[in-house]
Amino acid sequence: MSLVDSDSDEEEDATSAQPYVNLMKRLIETNPQKAKRRKLDHAPAEDNQPEAAPAPESGDEDERDDEQEEQRDVDEVEEAEEDTADIQPEDLFDEDDDLDETDPFETHISNPDENTVPPRVRAAQNGKWKMQRQPFESTRAYWSYPQTEDGQELPLPAPITSVSNLHLKKRLKEVMEFKRSTFGVVEKTVAPFLFNYRDMLYCDRTVGSSQDLRNLAALHALNHLYKTRDRVIKNNARLAKADANEDLELRDQGFTRPKVLMLLPTRQSCVKMVDSILSVCQPDQQENRKRFEDGYIEKLSKFSDDKPEDFRDLFSGNDDDMFRLGMKFTRKSVKYFSQFYNSDIIFASPLGLRMAIGSEEERKVDFDFLSSIELVIVDQADALLMQNWEHVEFIFEHLNIQPKDAHGCDFSRVRSWYLDDQAKYFRQTVVFSAFNTPELAELMRAHCHNWAGKVRLQQECPGTIQYLPVKARQTFSRFDAPTVAADPDARFNYFTKAIVPLLTKRNAKDANSTLIFIPSYLDFVRVRNFFANNPIVEAVTFGTISEYADIPEASRARSHFLTGRHKVLLYTERAHHFRRYQIKGVKRVIMYSLPDNPLFYREIAGGYLQKSEQSLMVEHGQGVVRVMFSKYDLMKLERIVGTSRVGKMIKEQGDTFDFV
């Protein structure tokens, strides 16, 4: 039964059938596709390079090309597509599970209510959403759901405090009750939305909570896969036993096999997620495990303890951001490097998956394997923002598009909402991030259409300025920008008129040892060119450190800044993210814009000035921080000054705010 209005009107019936008719026409016209070879055998185009990737540190270009080719071969897979009907009864994960009509898998995926769900889908299609702000557990919940014409509310899910509250497959419940029967604060906050198939943006991920979040994501993904697989196997048995004249309509599948997509920043983060999955499924056999260890695991520690905890958590191990990995599950084994169309879970970095999809220019485009994704997990989204976010957007734009080829699909078994081109309204998207940003908010707005609703979970911010390791005079100056598009020009004009004169006036000894922190690379280029070419600042010597500076270049800039040869140092947020330089000699910090990551404010505005005090380069409490902001910096500003202050700073008539 299709999830559309059950009107008897012929015109509406024809309209509702149109997606299925179009799909079948397209598949008939398309030639059968041969077995695919999943290999990245084309060099990345310049546009596909991560915007913030640091330049190679050493080695000539030929050596780098060889290394890149070798790295690409790590994930190469040569394997034919399997017959989706070739699943044996002995592959059942659990033989004695009883059907529970209250199970979220049933109510959301397998057997959605034909009376209540279609109006929600229609409201989501029309962009009619209602948002409510409610306290939930230990955080704030911004809850949105499709608003139907009858105005019926969609309440928040019931609390979940332990494994016993979950509808888990028997074998998973047994493992979890032994490992962790009760939940902590983070798990109690996340679990109700995760296991009830709500879209979720969780904005309080920390190093300390990361393992709990991974474990929950792994458990939910496996539970979804096991239930999907067992339903198919049991229905196969029913069809095999059915009489020839018995009309059984058993719709239990999508177009292609992959059901879960996990977007992760590095190979090491992939290793951590895989380990969480293995700790729950506990397979007897692991096919291609040695190959996985060789290509993904680095056991030697690369960083000393003086690097911040979040930096070591992200970049320790194999920090390559170019990978994609298919994983296939059977009752007793897992297989690494399975062909995408034979995989249950796809692990990938945004860049790796973008390259696997291909490009129109090369006429090698394939994203059919994303057509039936029902669960997307985006972990460490704040780290992905420091890569090329356009790759993430590209991937979401290609999710749940009806396939160009059949791939051996039995259309009599495909769920109705797939045939009706409604899959994106049933897909669950879960994003874990250390903080919220406009990019993440837009991702939730533009690509999360779940009929069951979506939530943003975010704690109130006390403000990073309270935790600086040194006393400093901090001045926040607000400038006006009429629109978001006009913000860059307004910011630059304010900088040249209000900030630059402080560096150029004749007795401006304070200009020495000034670090200018610039989050955006485009803004960095603009300011760099201004210092290089404008006669107003010709007397101000300056150096630069961006994400593209190699190690020797950055070392020279730091040295010249420390000795005073360069009065000003321009420093980008991505350079700090990827390197976490300990820059010495800073007496004044000017923030062209606030960092997205509030930890960076503490490290730069506090940590750099603290080092200068300890080396007696600046007197105690005499360090200066000057911050430029507009109303469009609301999210960043809240994390720095705190939730209780941000409203006044954005709305009050005064435009200067001092903190000590």
UniProtKB/Swiss-Prot annotation:
Keyword Transcription assigned: no
Disulfide bonds: none
Presence of keyword Lipid biosynthesis: no
Keyword terms: Nucleus, Ribonucleoprotein, Ribosome biogenesis, rRNA processing
UniProt-annotated location(s): Nucleus, Nucleolus
Pfam families: Utp25_C, UTP25_NTPase-like
Biased composition (Acidic residues): 1-14, 58-104
GO molecular function, one term: rRNA binding
Family the entry assigns: Belongs to the UTP25 family.
Self-association and partners: Component of the ribosomal small subunit (SSU) processome composed of at least 40 protein subunits and snoRNA U3.
Name of the featured protein: U3 small nucleolar RNA-associated protein 25
Gene: UTP25
